[in-house]
Swiss-Prot record:
One of its GO terms (cellular component) is synaptic membrane. It is a multi-pass membrane protein. It comes from Mus musculus. This is Sodium-dependent proline transporter. The modification Phosphothreonine is found at T20, T588. Keywords: Amino-acid transport, Cell membrane, Glycoprotein, Membrane, Neurotransmitter transport, Phosphoprotein, Symport, Synapse, Transmembrane, Transmembrane helix, Transport. One of its GO terms (molecular function) is L-proline transmembrane transporter activity. Residues 1-45, 557-637 are cytoplasmic. The keyword Hydrolase does not apply. One of its GO terms (biological process) is proline transport.
Length: 637
């Protein structure tokens, strides 16, 4: 990789050397696209958008369960360690790439066109996730509307969707307290409401025969996409204002649920169950892997959302400070959500007379079965149910804004002349296409397809993308050069901590996660349903497709160059001639070349087009590159 970094230092820079064959058309490089691309209207827009993107549904329904099953309070030790080793450095790397270049996940690979396939893989992953994520928002909308009643519909048995196994677990009292119930032989009204009414899963014969479309879910999904479209209609200028509400209001609701939860009888029992340290769990590698997975997915690294949001920043936005605010805020929110969830579960376990571990679940089972059942035990249950699902709605929408903005930005940056003036129309077409592709999720067996997408769309493929990104930036482009870019942007170079993580610790951690996910692979399942072999194969191919986009992109990049294979690799790995800050005023240092007698420095590629070749002695960029190479040689000695 070092040879690839230094290959371009051996020749004087000429237009033919800097331009790929596809770049050699008659293009006016003086055109400035930064102004009409748009920016955040304020620094707080970006910060709240990042908080809303990271603080999502997983903070409520995954972290608390993961914590209590992996050592309780002891889980926080590997959690914060993995945050420091993997989460914060990768978060900062992705923000730095986006802000420095003002480009989306595809165009940002001007940094090294050889790896543009990683950007395409990001888009595939985020597209698949956006399809099923909005279905979860549709479920939330369904429950939100169902909460607008005097009595919650999942509170009692006796409805047409209930079976003879339905039992209202009210905790029958004995003289000394609560009689324990055998929950394994009965089904709660909330569980039958979810599976038999909302999903109507009994109408499906499996993933291969999903049954009919549920019109109520179909309408909820349509409403979810309409909301998303309206919020991203004007890009970050509209979504940046919506997040002032959607990123902050969940904290108010979470605080209300927390206060209500801790005042319930039995709440302390649930909190103890959640946070009592069990340090012997730290001896298990599984706990450390689970902590790393939680960090990796909760921060949204590798989906392109962080890169996209940062690309709309001004060049000198302090993303170093923002990185710590968002990542630590995300961690604290997860812990607080655990208190709100387990305080209510403790109350529920006391009312039912069963241990907390019999009522605690993760994922949709917590959001759509257990917590709704707990709400029925509270006074003013529709009010608390509405608040809970409204919180989930706002948490989900923030993340969905990022997913859609990532796709729209990536494609419009690739075709700015055609799509940027019609960005709103293009956004609408994307929403319509994804709504149509998501209709299979509204069928009786739609949950099976949702589980398949959730298990495979962003699994090992996402890890491969992030590892590739990390290595391409730090090893091929060069850690010294990348740190100089950050210095130009922020006024300081990242220290030893970030360099060590980018070069060694973060890739090693991700590689361990990748190996673990492959070795510990388990077939998908939903309840007692086991997926057929063809569905498992489809899921694996889904994950492999994103991985295969990386070598496919390399092949395309190499074929576009000329010369021998090694020369093509050198040229394809070299930064594109127009790589750098988008605004001419920010092109300083290695991105400016001053000709003898010139009164005003111009961007390097403008000089190359107007004045021809520049020898290495007159080229500031090449002098800086040589200085970088010398520093790297000294560090190796």
């Amino acid at each position: 990789m070092k040879k690839l970094q230094e290959a371009h230092l051996r020749k004087p820079i000429t237009p033919d050397l800097l331009m790929t064959p596809s770049d050699q058309g008659d293009v006016d490089l003086d055109v400035d696209f930064a102004a009409d691309r748009g920016n955040w209207t304020g620094k707080l827009d970006f910060l709240l958008s990042c908080i809303g993107y990271c603080v999502g549904l997983g903070n409520v329904w995954r972290f608390p369960y993961r914590a209590y099953t992996n050592g309780g309070g002891a889980f926080l030790v590997p959690y914060f360690l993995m945050l420091a080793i993997c989460g914060i450095p990768l978060f900062f790397l992705e923000l730095s790439l986006g802000q420095f270049s003002s480009l989306g996940p595809l165009a940002v690979w001007k940094i090294s066109p050889l790896f543009k396939g990683a950007g395409a893989a990001m888009l595939l992953i985020v597209g698949l996730v956006a399809i099923y994520y909005n279905m979860i928002i549709a479920y939330v909308l369904f429950y939100l509307f169902a909460s607008l009643t005097s009595n919650l519909p999942w509170e009692h048995c006796g409805n047409w969707w209930n079976t003879e196994l339905c039992l209202e677990h009210r905790g029958p009292k004995s003289g000394n307290g609560v009689l324990p119930l055998n929950l394994s032989s009965t089904v709660s009204p909330s569980e039958e409401y979810w599976s038999r009414y909302v999903l109507h899963i009994q109408g499906s014969q499996g993933i291969g025969r999903p049954g009919e479309i549920r019109w109520n879910l179909c309408l909820c999904l349509l409403l979810a996409w309409v909301i998303v479209f309206l919020c991203i209609l004007k890009g970050v200028k509209s979504s940046g204002k919506v997040v002032y509400f959607t990123a902050t209001f969940p904290y108010l609701i979470l605080l209300m649920l927390l206060v209500r939860g801790v005042t319930l009888p039995g709440a302390w029992k649930g909190i103890q169950f959640y946070l009592t340290p069990q340090f012997h769990h730290l001896l298990s590698s599984k706990v450390w892997i689970e902590a790393a997975l939680q960090i990796f997915y909760s921060l949204g690294v590798g989906f392109g959302g962080l890169l996209t949001f940062a690309s709309y920043n001004t060049f000198h936005q302090n993303i170093y400070r923002d990185t710590f605010i968002v990542t630590l805020g995300n961690a604290i929110t997860s812990i607080l959500a655990g208190f709100a969830i387990f305080s209510v579960l403790g109350y529920m376990s006391q009312e039912l007379g069963v241990p907390v571990d019999q009522v605690a679940k993760a994922g949709p089972g917590l959001a759509f079965v257990v917590y709704p059942q707990a709400m029925t035990m509270l006074p003013l249950s529709p009010f608390w149910s509405f608040l809970f699902f409204f919180m989930l709605l706002t948490l989900g929408l923030d993340s969905q804004f990022a997913f859609l903005e990532t796709i729209v930005t990536a494609v419009t940056d690739e075709f700015p002349y055609y799509l940027r003036p019609k960005k709103a129309v293009f956004s609408g077409l994307i929403c319509v296409a994804m709504y149509l592709m998501g209709l299979i999720l509204t069928t009786d067996g739609g949950m099976y397809w949702l589980v398949l997408l959730d298990d495979y769309s962003a699994s090992f493929g996402l890890m491969v993308v992030v590892i590739t990104t990390c290595l391409a930036v730090t090893r091929v482009y060069g850690i010294q050069r990348f740190c100089r870019d950050i210095h130009m942007m922020l006024g300081f170079k990242p220290g030893l901590y970030f360099r060590a993580c980018w070069l060694f610790l973060s890739p090693a951690t991700l590689l361990a996660l990748l190996v673990y996910s492959i070795v510990k692979y388990q077939p998908s399942e939903y309840g007692s349903y086991r997926f057929p072999a063809w569905a498992e194969l489809l899921g694996i191919l889904m994950g492999l497709l994103s991985c295969l986009m990386i070598p496919a992109g390399m092949l395309v990049a190499v074929l576009r160059e000329e010369g021998s294979l090694w020369e093509r690799l050198q040229q394809a790995s070299r930064p594109a001639m127009d790589w750098g800050p988008s605004l001419e005023e920010n092109r300083t240092g290695m991105y400016v070349a001053t000709l003898a007698g010139s009164q005003s420095p111009k961007p390097l590629m403008v000089h190359m087009r107007k004045y021809g070749g520049i020898t290495s002695f007159e080229n500031t960029a090449i002098e800086v590159d040589r200085e970088i190479a010398e520093e790297e040689e000294e560090s190796m000695m």
